[in-house]
Amino acid sequence: MLHFIVNLNFRINTYKMKKFKIEFKWAVIMSIIFLAWMTLEKQLGFHDEKIKWQMFFTMLIIFPNFLLYYLALNDKKKNYYNGEMNWKQGFISGVVISFIVVIFSPITQFITHEFITPNYFDKLIALSVESKRLTLEEAKSYFNLTAYIWQSISGGLSFGIVIGAIVAYILKPKTTNSTIKSN
């Protein structure tokens, strides 16, 4: 009997994992692109001599992220929903991607700040204090790995949900079809 229960639980979990396989794939791709973007920022000097412009350059990641969400939800539409995905299904897929990206965000932040640009926080703290925008204590409390992990979690979740909703709207069918497979 125990074997049957364990086997049934495995089948249910396997089904759930297959249901979100596409979202997981795209969340991994998005995390890798984030690390590549951080490497690009570092190589272009936005973590060193151009650090005062880094915030503006970082905002440009919205364009590749929007494209990635579009590709991800289009993949879900074509390969899971057979070309017919309504807004709700696309939105749920976008939310799932956002949650998975958020789960990866502590790891990507750690890699970024320990390996790609280990002196980043020191430079931001120095810039903030020199420009008299923050006191040393304020800068240290704002520019550290823990704070950036929390910022990436909240920002990634809110950004992902909004972009997922927009992309789901773009990809929804032009006419309402009541035969679309629902979740």
Task: Give the positions of each predicted feature.
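Ordered, amphipathic secondary-structure segments that act as subunit-interaction surfaces
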Residues: 83, 90-111, 115
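Membrane-helix interface/capping segments
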Residues: 70-89
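Transmembrane alpha-helical insertion/packing segments
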Residues: 2-5, 11-70
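Alpha-helical membrane-inserting segments
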Residues: 33-44, 68-76, 104-112, 162-170
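Short, charged juxtamembrane terminal tails flanking transmembrane helices
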Residues: 19-20, 171-183
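Functional transmembrane-helix hotspots
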Residues: 107-131
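Alpha-helical transmembrane spans of integral membrane proteins, capturing the lipid-embedded, hydrophobic core
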Residues: 23, 27-35, 62-66, 94-98, ...
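Hydrophobic alpha-helical transmembrane segments
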Residues: 135-161
